[in-house]
Swiss-Prot record:
InterPro entries cross-referenced by the UniProt entry: Ribosomal_uS11, Ribosomal_uS11_bac-type, Ribosomal_uS11_CS, Ribosomal_uS11_sf
Source taxonomy: Bacteria, Pseudomonadati, Campylobacterota, Epsilonproteobacteria, Campylobacterales
Entries under Gene3D superfamilies matching the protein: Ribosomal protein S11 (3.30.420.80)
Protein name stated in the entry: Small ribosomal subunit protein uS11
Native organism: Campylobacter curvus (strain 525.92)
Subunit structure, interactors included: Part of the 30S ribosomal subunit. Interacts with proteins S7 and S18. Binds to IF-3.
Annotated family: Belongs to the universal ribosomal protein uS11 family.
Record GO biological process: translation
Gene behind the chain: rpsK
Its job: Located on the platform of the 30S subunit, it bridges several disparate RNA helices of the 16S rRNA. Forms part of the Shine-Dalgarno cleft in the 70S ribosome.
Entry GO CC: ribonucleoprotein complex; ribosome
Gene Ontology molecular function: rRNA binding; structural constituent of ribosome
Keywords on record: Ribonucleoprotein, Ribosomal protein, RNA-binding, rRNA-binding
PANTHER family according to UniProt: 40S RIBOSOMAL PROTEIN S14/30S RIBOSOMAL PROTEIN S11
Length: 130
């Protein structure tokens, strides 16, 4: 009996000019996702995924590194213009937004805060006592 040949499909990368950078800055981590205009993910990165552990994940420097990593991956797909959507109260939020504008060859078109605000919904967690 003859053996079957395994045929590998070639990976076709689409050239995408415009995209959206979603920055989710929580108290413990910062996640960055680059999508096309339809919302399909192109590249992503997070502070924890880059090797920052524990309390170092929530630092502004870790957020900056996560943004640079995600945008460098997205540049391979031909991204030239991005809009920024920021969510969450984290400490890396401002630094992440600034570092998107600092990346070479990428133009920022808009900046929007999409943090969900409760209209007297769920009761918030109790205050910490240290």
């Amino acid at each position: 009996m003859a053996k079957r040949k395994i045929v590998k499909k070639k990976v076709v990368r689409k050239s995408i000019a415009k995209g959206i950078v979603y920055i989710s800055a929580t108290f413990n981590n910062t996640m960055v996702t680059v999508t096309d205009e339809m919302g399909n993910a192109i590249a992503w990165s997070s502070a924890g995924g880059l090797g920052f552990k524990g309390s170092k994940k929530s630092t502004p420097y870790a957020a900056q590194q996560a943004v640079e990593d995600a945008l460098n991956k997205a540049k391979e797909h031909g991204i030239k213009e991005v809009g920024i959507k920021v969510q969450g109260p984290g400490s890396g939020r401002e630094t992440a937004v600034k570092s998107v504008g600092a990346v070479e060859g990428i133009k920022v078109t808009f900046l929007k805060d999409i943090t969900p605000l409760a209209h007297n919904g769920c009761r918030p967690p109790k205050r910490r006592r240290v």
